[in-house]
From Swiss-Prot:
GO annotation, biological process: tRNA splicing, via endonucleolytic cleavage and ligation
Name of encoding gene: kptA
Full protein name: Probable RNA 2'-phosphotransferase
Keyword terms of this UniProt record: NAD, Transferase
Single GO MF descriptor: NAD+ poly-ADP-ribosyltransferase activity
Length: 181
């Protein structure tokens, strides 16, 4: 992804996941924004977007952070919101084991409190160890936690999967995970 697309992706993440009000944009209950309104609101705050650039970011983003509506007129972030949105996610049966990547400096707090959403709506989990390591590296020296998702679900915890394959849950108490690296 070139630098311009990366910058637009970061801007869209910030606006659609955390601060739509920063550009006077209103999202609907499902987190959707009209692309035309997004372009107009962004331009009033010196961020110049086009429908073509927005759609290119959606298509080229390797993490599939965004989704377009079927008619191509609306956009939303797939997950990671710190604002309340209803993503219409249905509970699903997760794989027996899921992973969470983090930095080792956060481990003591995580072991004491469990995995918390940390300002987001959900805790983000991965079906792959490799993805969890990559996520952990973004925050420093990585460590990976292996979550017993089968046991959690059996104990009544709900799991969801976002459009881009990230597994989500509200909280992971410490008794359901072990450090594997």
């Amino acid at each position: 992804m070139d630098q311009q697309l990366k910058a637009v992706s970061k801007f869209l993440s910030y606006i659609l996941r955390h601060r739509p009000e920063a550009i006077s944009l209103e999202l609907n209950a499902g987190g959707w924004a009209a692309i035309s309104e997004l372009i107009q609101c962004a331009s009033k705050h010196d961020h110049f977007l086009s429908e073509e650039i927005i759609k290119e970011v959606v298509v080229s983003n390797d993490k599939k952070r965004f989704k377009l509506s079927e008619d191509g007129q609306y956009i939303r972030a797939n997950q990671g919101h710190s604002i309340r949105v209803d993503l219409d996610l249905l509970p699903l049966t997760p794989p027996d084991v899921l992973f969470h990547g983090t930095a080792t400096r956060f481990l003591a707090s995580i072991m004491a409190k469990g995995l918390l959403p940390s300002g987001r709506q959900h805790v983000h989990l991965s079906a792959s160890y490799e993805t969890a390591i990559a996520v952990g590296r973004r925050h420093g020296k990585p460590t990976v936690l292996e979550i017993n998702a089968q046991k959690m679900q059996g104990d009544g915890y709900l799991f969801y999967r976002s459009e881009n394959g990230v597994w989500l849950t509200d909280h992971v108490p410490a008794q359901y995970f072990v450090e594997v690296e």
